[in-house]
């Protein structure tokens, strides 16, 4: 009977695990295989053996080329930089917002959460194109800055790294807010009431109760924000210049413009490896936070 109980979770999880293997692991293995083909040489034509790659070949030439390609390392560096900056901005702006929503009365909380969620109901293209107009040389932002006398010429807010950061932050921050809010909702507010009853101020209660117990949720939100930002495509593609390319954008260009599938696949593998390393490094403090505060938050 005990063995059957131990087996039950695996039985329930089996369909999901199988689905993940089919939809994630198999395409990843195919991506690795394509990266080991010889390139098609940019010839005209379409399909396997045409201009994409030469089937049946095995080579590490693409990887050795990437290792010595300064262009690739510049793109990778910008991608990581963008991920870190966007994740930091999402946490800096998202935590206070989530905390504010958490403190709202119940009747206003649903409206505030709805306002966060509604930003994800429109198409990403519509959102970014709208932002492109807002950040344009003659858009509302530059018009206001000029009217207020803060600038004498339009600021370059689009086709720049600034525009990419703003756009990607706008796309990612709703997830950050929702994840942190969900973590805060698990906290027992009677702890704060008890602290106030003992004479603790709001700042002391936040620093010694709310913040420590919300650290696991904060760590999870940071990781999710970083993963989303590292895979940025639409924001750098529409709001950046050729100097603000991410790996996701260059993969698309290599595969569909240059028709060099092995290089595009190898860059995709590089992005996957980079993301895996960052997640592995992040897992160490995250696991420590879960051990130190996660169980305490659950049992408090």
How would you name each of these model-derived features?
Residues 4-9, 49, 60-71, 237-283, ...:
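Interhelical loop and adjacent transmembrane-helix boundary motif
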Residues 21-70, 134, 138-139, 144, ...:
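Short membrane-interfacial helix/loop motifs at transmembrane-helix boundaries
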Residues 27-31, 128, 176-179, 217-249:
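Non-cytoplasmic
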């Amino acid at each position: 009977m005990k063995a059957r109980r131990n087996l039950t979770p695996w039985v329930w999880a089996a369909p999901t695990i199988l689905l993940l293997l089919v939809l994630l692991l198999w395409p990843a293995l195919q991506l690795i295989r394509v990266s080991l083909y010889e390139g098609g040489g940019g010839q005209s034509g379409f399909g396997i053996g045409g201009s994409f790659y030469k089937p049946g070949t095995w080579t590490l030439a693409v990887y050795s080329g990437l290792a010595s390609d300064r262009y690739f390392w510049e793109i990778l560096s910008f991608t990581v930089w963008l991920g870190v900056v966007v994740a930091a901005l999402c946490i800096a702006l998202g935590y206070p917002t989530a905390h504010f929503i958490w403190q709202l009365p119940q009747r206003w909380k649903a409206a505030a959460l709805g306002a966060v969620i509604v930003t994800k109901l429109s198409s990403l293209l519509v959102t970014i194109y709208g932002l492109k107009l807002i950040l344009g040389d003659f858009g509302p932002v530059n018009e206001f800055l000029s009217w207020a006398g803060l600038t004498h010429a339009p600021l370059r807010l689009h086709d720049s790294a600034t525009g990419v950061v703003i756009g990607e932050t706008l796309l990612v921050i709703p997830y950050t807010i929702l994840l942190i809010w969900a973590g805060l909702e698990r906290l027992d507010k009677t702890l704060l009431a008890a602290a106030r009853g003992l004479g603790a101020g709001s700042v002391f209660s936040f620093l010694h109760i709310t913040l420590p117990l919300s650290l696991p949720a904060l760590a999870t939100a940071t990781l999710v924000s970083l993963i989303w930002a590292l895979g940025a495509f639409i924001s750098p593609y529409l709001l950046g210049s050729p100097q603000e390319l991410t790996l996701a954008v260059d993969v698309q260009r290599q595969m569909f413009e240059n028709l060099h599938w092995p290089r595009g696949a190898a860059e995709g593998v590089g992005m996957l490896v980079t993301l895996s390393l960052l997640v592995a490094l992040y897992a160490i403090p995250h696991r420590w936070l879960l051990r130190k505060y996660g169980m305490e938050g659950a049992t408090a």
